[in-house]
Amino acid sequence: GFADLFGKAVDFIKS
């Protein structure tokens, strides 16, 4: 869902 996509985006930005 949207939460999963947002979590992936945050993970990508933080890495």
UniProtKB/Swiss-Prot annotation:
One of its GO terms (cellular component) is extracellular region. Expressed by the skin glands. Its main location: secreted. It comes from the Eukaryota. Keywords: Amidation, Amphibian defense peptide, Secreted. The keyword rRNA-binding does not apply. GO terms for biological process: defense response; negative regulation of nitric-oxide synthase activity. It is found in: Secreted. The modification Serine amide is found at residue 15. The keyword Acetylation does not apply. Inhibits the formation of NO by neuronal nitric oxide synthase with an IC(50) of 26.4 uM. This is Signiferin-4.2.
